[in-house]
Regions:
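Generic structural signal for small/hydrophobic residues in well-ordered secondary structure
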Residues: 1, 19, 37, 67, ...
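Short amphipathic alpha-helices in soluble, non-transmembrane regions
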Residues: 116, 197-205, 256-261
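PLP-dependent aminotransferase-like
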Residues: 7-68, 72-75
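Short beta-strand segments
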Residues: 151, 184-191, 209-213, 241-243
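Short, conserved alpha-helix that lines the donor NDP-sugar binding/gating region
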Residues: 2-7, 170
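Active-site region of PLP-dependent enzymes
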Residues: 72-77, 83-190
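PLP-dependent enzyme catalytic core of the Aspartate aminotransferase-like
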Residues: 223-264
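Conserved PLP cofactor-binding pocket of PLP-dependent enzymes
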Residues: 70, 125-131, 196-228, 234-240
């Protein structure tokens, strides 16, 4: 979805520009920006506070792009965006509303909506009869499959309950570990050495993760540039994500909390 957003902008802005993104971010965001052909350069910033919330991915002259990231709430677009803006939602399997990957672009701008609707369907205009569709421009085969849609529709049925359970889980973690985390996708804490901590937890049967390594230090993106991201450089070795699953039983949660406390 992020890739497609930049492709749409590229159709009428010919000069590529620089994009500012947090260094601690999933590589998919950086990759989408670069491969879209719109942005020729990444500028990594030392923003470590965006996690758990949506954030402005890019501010164009006439509208902004918001990545909902780990957040999904009723009426979110109207609360955070103007009609001409774009908001991206991810259906990654472990996100609040998970599917079999893919995502969604939301806008109240009809011209943008029309372009995306055609772009994801091979650049073809819409018609009730498939054979009456015309080719507007070279597009992409990026529309949601029936299987993806079915999985999402089924997950919608239990979405409210899932959010309530995840909030209770986050609140319990906050109480036990002294944090004020609000994300219902990732629960991150700091340890002295996240790799050692993760290996120890794995031995105890607890799977944790790192969200995320600092991309500005990765050779793929670092073309001899030096970015001032001291917080990201520290946190990439200290941040760790605890299990965040609505299926966790009380005994499993109690076990996780006890073992984390023993090893931090």
């Amino acid at each position: 979805a992020i890739f497609l957003i930049m492709k749409e902008k590229r159709t009428y802005v010919r000069e590529p520009v620089k994009i500012n993104i947090p260094s601690m971010i999933p590589p998919v965001v950086a990759n989408a920006a670069l491969t879209s052909g719109f942005f020729h350069e990444l500028n990594f910033v030392d923003d470590v506070d965006w996690m758990g919330d949506s954030y402005v991915l890019h501010q164009f002259k006439d509208f902004k792009v918001v990545d909902s990231a780990q957040k999904l709430q009723k009426g979110q677009f109207r609360k955070e965006c103007n009609p001409e803006d774009l908001m991206v939602f991810s259906f990654y399997p472990t996100k609040p509303l998970g599917g079999s990957d893919g995502g969604m672009i939301v806008t109240d701008d009809y011209e943008k909506y029309k372009w995306y609707k055609e772009a994801v369907l091979n650049g073809m205009s819409y018609a009730e009869n498939n054979w009456d569709r015309g080719i507007s421009f070279p597009g992409y085969k990026m529309y949601m499959s029936s299987i993806q849609a079915r999985i999402l529709l089924n997950n919608f049925k239990t979405f409210d309950k899932k959010m309530r359970v995840l909030k209770q889980l986050s609140d319990t973690y906050n109480k036990e570990f002294g944090y004020e985390n609000t994300s219902q996708h990732l629960y991150r804490i700091e340890v002295l050495d996240n790799k050692k901590f993760i290996n120890k937890m794995k031995q105890l049967g607890i799977v944790c993760g790192i969200h995320y390594p600092a991309l500005h230090l990765n050779d793929v993106y670092n073309k001899n540039w030096k970015w001032d991201c001291p917080k990201s450089e520290v946190l990439q070795n200290r941040t760790v994500s605890l299990p965040m699953n609505e299926k966790l039983s009380f005994l499993e949660l109690e076990y996780i909390i006890d073992k984390v406390k023993e090893n931090i």
